[in-house]
Regions:
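Membrane-anchoring hydrophobic helices of lipid-metabolizing enzymes
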Residues: 1-77, 83-94, 98, 104, ...
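A short, conserved acidic/glycine-rich loop-to-beta-strand motif
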Residues: 105-109, 201-204
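Glycine- and acidic
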Residues: 76-77, 133, 168
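Short beta-strand->loop
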Residues: 81, 108-111, 132-133, 151, ...
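Non-catalytic C-terminal accessory region of glycerolipid acyltransferases
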Residues: 140-251
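Short helix/loop capping segments that flank catalytic or ligand/cofactor-binding pockets
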Residues: 88-90, 117-118, 173-174, 214
Length: 251
């Protein structure tokens, strides 16, 4: 953990993001404080919370959440969410959980988003686990079993909650129907039938909504390109641009 942290604080991309959100910060002192942290829980509570509170103050008129009071703080859940923003959907849920005294969730993130080493380090420090998105057809079932097994393990053995998007990729047209293959993947693991396997991981539907979507024009452009060319694939630069605009734009 500490070795990853030492590398992270030297990365220009990380420094740029921190300085943008926390304009008056003494970055050198901030880095010294980071290097005193030695576990993921403290990293989320002491660092990510401050970052996200600053971000919401700067780029929103406020963040609210409903029905968090129905969650049992002693239990772990699979938060299955609609998908609007690459970075913020899970991060803002975790901020709301922290505000309400509920433990944060681990975050499922596609390996296609690990564009730079410092991003890979940051997401792992922030309780993320990697979903393999670039496997061939023959490896897809093995990857699904591995992912399903880990989620069941996290919920039932580690007592950690998990966030996962209800579909692969952000919805570009507000169609939030859950991807059928995701439900099948979650039901692969466990000792019972499909229904009991799904019950085991305590699925909680989550709906997230942004008043304004700073990436709306990017999504519209991508939707148009895919309509005209079904084989169109985004580049890593496209994903990175969407991550930056989503984080820093007003929403």
């Amino acid at each position: 953990f500490h070795d990853k942290m030492k590398v992270l604080v030297t990365e220009p991309g990380f420094e740029h993001a921190v300085r943008y959100v926390l304009r008056d910060i003494n970055y050198e002192l901030f880095c010294q404080e980071l290097l005193t942290i030695d576990n993921k829980k403290d990293f989320q509570l002491l660092v990510m919370r401050s970052f996200l509170e600053g971000l919401t103050q700067k780029t929103t008129k406020g963040l609210t959440g409903n029905n968090l009071d129905v969650l049992d703080k002693a239990k772990s859940y699979t938060f299955m969410s609609n998908h609007r923003d690459i970075v913020l959907d899970a991060s803002l849920l975790n901020l709301l959980l922290i505000r309400n005294g509920i433990k944060t969730s681990e975050i499922a993130i596609g390996n296609n988003l690990l564009i730079y080493d410092w991003i890979s380090d940051l997401v792992r420090l922030n309780k993320s686990f990697i979903v393999k998105r670039d496997v061939g057809v023959r490896q897809m079932l093995d990857a699904a079993r591995q992912l399903s097994g880990y989620i069941h393990f996290a919920i039932t053995k580690k007592n950690e909650s998990v966030w996962i998007a209800q579909r692969e990729g952000r919805s570009k047209d507000s169609d939030d129907r859950t991807q059928e293959s995701l439900i099948k993947m979650l039901g692969i693991s466990g000792e019972g039938d499909l229904i009991n396997n799904l019950k085991e991981i305590n699925i909680v539907p989550v709906s997230i909504s942004y008043e304004y979507d700073p990436c709306d024009y990017l999504k519209a452009h991508e939707f148009l390109l895919k309509r005209d060319n079904p084989d169109f694939k985004k580049s890593q630069r496209d994903d990175l641009h969407s991550m930056e605009i989503g984080l820093l734009g007003f929403k």
